[in-house]
């Protein structure tokens, strides 16, 4: 197996040497000033009752925003639904929602972020028929949601829920116990938002008579605080509830609010099996609410139906897994309240059709490949539309299949990464395509024939610009790990690569459960930085090791209870194989990563000191004891149950093995991976009298951005590698 691995790399090395012209070189500033940013369709939404889609447009010269509707068939603009030119009270639009009857628009302005997904905005409701603009509240509110007929808007403000009546313009407060760091109604707490990936924890039923919501009791959740330094004499302190692994989580409960009666009822749930409520969604039956619940270990998921008239629950579906179960938004109810569901219970993520009583009607898709996105169901021809990796785990294609599992058809035709936005009648879709060699483009496609109707947008100008930079190429391959698994990988070599010379190598990875870095899509900012390094004489290699995604549940869940063990082993093994290549300077191999990738790069340098010379860790987890409960326990259970799993693979445990060059970077306002992680590791390294470098960014969060911050950060990392690798 090792011989095959080396031959493969050697094959890459012997590729013809391209003639190098005197062209521009990438600079760090160029990466972050928008030079390489591709054009894209902003805020594209499919309308519900018309064969149209809407787009948020901005006229920079006039400084006006418009919400425009386009015909799916002709791609011609049909009308401007809303323009700030006619409504000067709205200076800018940050987001918008069109209701299900396409006659009202919720418009957000004065955007103010809270955490990763949450924000407050001032919202207006625009009636397309009357052209009347109504301010929902004078306050900056969260997550307003129109009911189906657009007569009422539910929203959250300062941890309480409200209902605004559009006709009377009166507001009813439906909860009163909301309090910061104590009780939240209808909005998720920090850990739900981060790890279950949603903010709005309420939903209207089909006829707008009932509002279901989740209440979060944070009283027993430990407090975390961060100093915000700013420029004042004394720093401010940001205090919020953050449950670390093994600590108390919010106690969640479910409620139903009857609009006509102005009354609320609690829905009784089992506290053990409903430890988490990661999703609520009304079915097509206005009297039936669906609720997904998880136990604390997240290895048993129940789908419940709640009768809103009686408040009684019934368990419709139960899934169990030896490791964990991922929560998705793919649940779709059909007219008869049977439902479409995705699951990896058979080893790969696939689509299933269940009857309304929870009995399996049919497994719709199957095979040793994964469904990666679900687009919708067309009841007219009983067809499901989805995205999958059937053509290889690094690629994405769009497919259709009948509800009974027949007549599967690939709708996308160009290799790479394809995603789709379908017209309301599913007769057309906008295909967003990119690949390692082709910048993003948007094309209108006829669904039935797969025929391309018209190109909507391309990035030919960007590709022309990039020709001036004579970029190296990403070469995709597979590498073997020590047990013979195929690992997806890419290698970037200098454009003037000479197989008779030796080059330093920088490895890049993220490695987190279910993640993917090696994929056939267009470049991101890290790619351009890697190209910059290649222009300076470095080879960059990335390999997705065990635990990463889209290759089946067994490969992804192998790391259960031992995060860092197999992932680190794979990166070290790949580095050792690279060191044997004649074109690699075996004494100059480094590795870097961010977040989970920083956890990995730290561990790789400490545990692989015989092969790694240098590592950069940005915002790393250094002990899973410091990270949040939902994410960590999903893969590790609790530290009380699995102390060795937490400690044996912690960089802090292996800090004494540090021999090479180590640059540790963190932002002090990181609400996700707290700077505590780096501080504890720093303290350990100092205690061990280890030489290392570190860089702290005051008041910067997990993304470490704002102003010139990213430019300064990547300049620092570039110079560090030039000096230390």
Please name every model-derived segment.
Residues 6-7, 13, 22-419, 427-428, ...:
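Beta-propeller folds
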Residues 11, 185-186, 489, 590:
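Glycine-centered structural positions embedded in regular secondary structure
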Residues 15-17:
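N-terminal signal peptide c-region/cleavage motif recognized by signal peptidases
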């Amino acid at each position: 197996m090792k011989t095959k691995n080396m031959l493969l790399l050697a094959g890459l090395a012997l590729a013809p040497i391209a003639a190098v012209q005197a062209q521009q070189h990438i600079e760090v500033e160029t990466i972050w000033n928008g030079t390489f940013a591709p054009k894209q369709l902003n805020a594209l939404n499919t309308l519900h009752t018309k064969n149209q889609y809407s787009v948020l447009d901005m006229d920079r010269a006039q400084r006006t925003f418009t919400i425009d509707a386009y015909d799916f068939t002709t791609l011609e603009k049909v009308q401007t639904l809303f323009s700030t030119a006619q409504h000067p009270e709205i200076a800018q639009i940050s987001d918008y929602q069109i209701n299900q009857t396409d006659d009202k628009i919720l418009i957000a302005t004065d955007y103010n972020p809270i955490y990763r997904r949450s924000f407050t905005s001032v919202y207006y409701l625009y009636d397309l028929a009357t052209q009347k603009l109504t301010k929902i509240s004078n306050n900056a509110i969260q997550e307003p949601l129109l009911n189906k007929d657009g007569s009422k808007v539910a929203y959250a403000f300062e941890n309480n829920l409200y209902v605004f009546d559009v006709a009377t313009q009166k507001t009813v407060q439906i909860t009163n116990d909301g309090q910061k760091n104590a009780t939240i109604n209808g909005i998720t707490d920090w850990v739900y938002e981060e790890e279950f990936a949603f903010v709005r924890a309420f939903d209207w039923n089909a006829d707008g008579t009932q509002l279901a919501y989740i209440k979060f009791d944070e009283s027993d959740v430990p407090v975390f605080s961060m100093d915000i330094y700013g420029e004042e004499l004394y720093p401010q302190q940001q205090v919020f509830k953050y449950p670390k692994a093994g600590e108390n989580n919010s106690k969640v409960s479910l409620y139903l609010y009857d609009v006509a009666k102005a009354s609320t009822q609690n829905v009784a749930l089992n506290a053990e099996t409903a430890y988490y409520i990661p999703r609520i969604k009304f079915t097509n039956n206005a009297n039936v609410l669906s609720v997904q619940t998880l136990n604390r270990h997240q290895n048993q998921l129940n789908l419940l139906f709640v009768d809103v008239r009686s408040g009684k629950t019934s368990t419709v579906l139960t899934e169990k897994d030896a490791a964990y179960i991922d929560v998705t938004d793919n649940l779709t109810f059909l007219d008869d309240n049977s439902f479409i569901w995705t699951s990896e219970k058979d080893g790969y993520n696939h689509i299933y059709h269940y009857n309304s009583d929870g009995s399996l009607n049919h497994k719709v898709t199957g095979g040793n490949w994964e469904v990666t996105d679900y687009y919708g169901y067309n009841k007219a021809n009983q067809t499901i539309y989805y995205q999958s990796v059937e053509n290889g785990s690094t690629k994405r294609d769009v497919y259709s299949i009948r509800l009974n599992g027949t007549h599967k058809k690939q709708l996308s035709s160009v290799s790479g990464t394809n995603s789709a936005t379908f017209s309301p009648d599913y007769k057309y879709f906008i295909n967003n395509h990119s690949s390692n060699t082709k910048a993003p483009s948007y094309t209108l496609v006829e669904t039935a024939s797969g025929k391309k109707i018209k190109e909507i947008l391309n990035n030919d100008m960007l590709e022309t610009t990039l020709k001036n930079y004579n970029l190296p190429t990403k070469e995709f391959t597979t590498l073997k790990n020590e047990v013979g698994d195929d690992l997806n990988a890419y290698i970037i070599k200098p454009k003037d690569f000479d197989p008779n010379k030796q080059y330093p190598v920088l490895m890049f990875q993220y490695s987190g459960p279910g993640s993917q870095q090696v994929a056939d899509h267009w470049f991101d900012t890290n790619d351009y930085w890697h190209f910059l390094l290649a222009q300076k004489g470095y080879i960059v290699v990335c390999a997705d090791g065990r635990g990463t995604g889209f290759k089946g549940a067994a490969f992804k869940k192998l790391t259960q209870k031992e995060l860092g063990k197999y992932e680190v082993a794979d990166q070290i093994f790949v580095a050792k194989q690279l060191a044997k290549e004649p074109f690699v300077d075996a004494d100059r191999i480094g590795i870097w990563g961010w977040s989970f990738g920083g956890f990995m790069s730290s561990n790789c340098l400490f545990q692989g000191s015989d092969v790694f010379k240098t590592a950069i860790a940005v915002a790393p987890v250094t002990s899973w004891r410091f990270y949040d409960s939902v994410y960590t326990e999903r893969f590790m259970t609790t530290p009380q149950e699995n102390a060795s799993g937490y400690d044996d693979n912690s960089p802090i445990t292996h800090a004494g093995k540090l021999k090479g060059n180590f640059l540790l970077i963190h932002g002090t306002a990181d609400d996700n991976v707290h700077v505590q992680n780096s501080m504890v590791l720093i303290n350990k390294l100092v205690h061990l009298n280890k030489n290392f470098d570190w860089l702290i960014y005051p008041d910067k969060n997990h993304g470490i951005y704002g102003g010139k911050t990213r430019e300064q950060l990547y300049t620092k990392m570039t110079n560090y590698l030039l000096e230390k690798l």
